[in-house]
């Protein structure tokens, strides 16, 4: 069979068929080995999720440390990690992650405390006014309130003007 660049080269479709066939074989082999990631439209796909490799490594190391520290049984030789990875987390990055997590918890505590304080302030203000009003109701304040309510009632009525027809003289006006 002549090469791709020769004068009497084969048709494009046969080249494409060969390429697609070889890619299909590679894909099937990777799928059998479990190395193929799910399609982006698949439910199992994590393509839209936010992922931080450093955070994953940090939490994985913390989980492993906690499991090792609480283990009471003897460790055997087969308890080594299942897979060897080249991804590691530096001490500097681990310290930075710890610091950021500490700041996040402090921010959360501050927000919770301020919300709690704000709720308490609302309750105290409402309850305090009612208690003070009930305590200071003497005869003098009752008389003052009664007098001011009478003054407010008379002032609120004001001058009542009836709407008549025509001009101010009372007769109809036609220009």
Swiss-Prot record:
Biased composition (Polar residues): 1-15, 72-88
Subunit text: Component of the nucleoplasmic and cytoplasmic pre-60S ribosomal particles. Interacts directly with ARX1.
GO (cellular component) term, any one: cytoplasm
Encoding gene per record: ALB1
Pfam family, one: Alb1
Record's miscellaneous remark: Present with 4780 molecules/cell in log phase SD medium.
Region ranges (Disordered): 1-43, 72-91
Protein name stated in the entry: Ribosome biogenesis protein ALB1
Biased amino acid composition, Basic residues: 16-29
Record localization: Cytoplasm; Nucleus
Classification lineage: Eukaryota, Fungi, Dikarya, Ascomycota, Saccharomycotina
Top-level division of the source organism's lineage: Eukaryota
GO BP annotations, alphabetical order: ribosomal large subunit biogenesis
Family per record: Belongs to the ALB1 family.
Main location: cytoplasm
Sorted UniProt keywords: Cytoplasm, Nucleus, Ribosome biogenesis, Transport
General function of this protein: With ARX1, involved in proper assembly of pre-ribosomal particles during the biogenesis of the 60S ribosomal subunit. Accompanies the pre-60S particles to the cytoplasm.
């Amino acid at each position: 069979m002549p090469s791709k660049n020769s004068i009497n080269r084969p048709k494009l479709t046969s080249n494409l068929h060969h390429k697609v066939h070889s890619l299909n074989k590679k894909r099937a082999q990777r799928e059998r080995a479990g190395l193929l990631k799910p399609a982006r439209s698949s439910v199992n796909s994590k393509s839209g999720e936010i992922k931080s490799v450093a955070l994953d490594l940090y939490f994985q190391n913390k989980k492993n440390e906690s499991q090792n520290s609480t283990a009471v049984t003897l460790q055997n030789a087969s308890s080594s990690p299942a897979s060897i990875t080249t991804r590691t987390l530096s001490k500097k990055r681990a310290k930075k992650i710890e610091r950021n997590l500490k700041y996040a918890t402090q921010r959360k505590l501050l927000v919770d405390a301020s919300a709690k304080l704000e709720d308490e302030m609302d309750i105290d203000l409402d309850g305090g006014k009612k208690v003070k009003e009930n305590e200071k109701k003497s005869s003098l304040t009752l008389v003052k309130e009664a007098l001011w309510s009478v003054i407010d009632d008379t002032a609120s009525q004001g001058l009542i003007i009836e709407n008549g027809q025509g001009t101010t003289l009372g007769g109809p006006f036609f220009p």
